[in-house]
A protein has these predicted regions:
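C-terminal alpha-helical "lid/dimerization" subdomain adjacent to the S-adenosyl-L-methionine
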Residues: 5, 150-205, 209, 215
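Conserved alpha-helix/loop element of class I SAM-dependent methyltransferases that forms part
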Residues: 27-48, 63
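Short glycine-dipeptide loop
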Residues: 70-71, 141-146
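Core SAM-dependent methyltransferase catalytic element
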Residues: 209-234
Length: 234
């Protein structure tokens, strides 16, 4: 089975329990990271057109929609029907006018230069073809636009890294599997983080995709990183 199909099936299966487990297992630190990213994204008073890629159940999408200027348009896409279905229910309860769509990040169904901002919250490591996904996001980003990526990473500090791996490789799969009934999904999470390129390799990939200015910020001892890529205005 291709990675894309496996990831879709896995997230379809864990979608009903995903939100509850995600916040418990991350100790709610993920909320703090998202707030930082949203501040970076919603940095202009004008209405923005925003695409949230790999939106999952819509947590990041919702925060963005609540913070951007009035009149903005926010769209979320994910490959998992199950995750999108949960997100649609959440949006309906909140009364937010946000469109969630099932779509492949490697073949986005939008015209060139369509969005002022693009976000990816903890999903870029799930791309089957990372370079293609980055190129697609660059394609649909408008000139002068900004891409903000949040992604988990391995801390550089030896003690923090030891604690991190103990939690990620032992505790998380056990608890996640116990609650969701799908231990494999919570074994995939740490393995996908360990395989994902560090800043020294990922930043050049953003450059190769076309982003003119790229930077990254380390959050919470390097457990999470925020990557920012800007498309030339001309």
């Amino acid at each position: 089975m291709a990675k894309k199909e496996g990831v879709k099936k896995m997230f379809d299966n864990i979608a009903p329990e995903y939100d509850k487990l995600n916040h418990i297992l991350s100790l709610n630190i993920d909320k703090r990271w998202r707030k930082k990213a949203v501040r970076e994204l919603a940095d202009e008073p004008r209405p923005l057109k925003v695409l949230d890629v790999a939106c999952g159940t819509g947590d990041f999408t919702i925060e963005i929609a609540q913070k951007v200027a009035h009149g903005s348009e926010v769209v979320g896409v994910d490959i998992s029907d199950g995750m999108i279905a949960v997100g649609v229910e959440k949006l309906a309860k909140l009364g937010l006018d946000v469109n969630l769509e099932v779509a492949d990040c490697e073949s986005l169904p939008y015209d060139d230069n369509s969005f002022d901002r693009i976000s990816v919250g903890f999903g870029v490591r799930n791309f089957e073809h990372l370079e293609l996904g980055l190129s697609e996001m660059y394609r649909v980003l408008a000139p002068g636009g900004k891409l903000i990526i949040l992604e988990l990473s391995v801390p550089s500090n030896a003690f923090i890294r030891w604690c991190y791996k103990l939690y990620f490789l032992k505790i998380l799969p056990f608890v996640g599997g116990l609650v969701s009934g799908n231990r494999g999904a919570y074994e995939y999470l740490p393995s996908s983080v360990l395989r994902f390129p560090g800043p020294d390799k990922f930043m050049p990939m953003l450059k190769d995709a076309g982003f003119e200015t790229v930077e990254h910020r380390s959050l919470t001892f390097g457990i999470c990183r925020m990557y920012i890529g800007k498309k030339s205005a001309v």
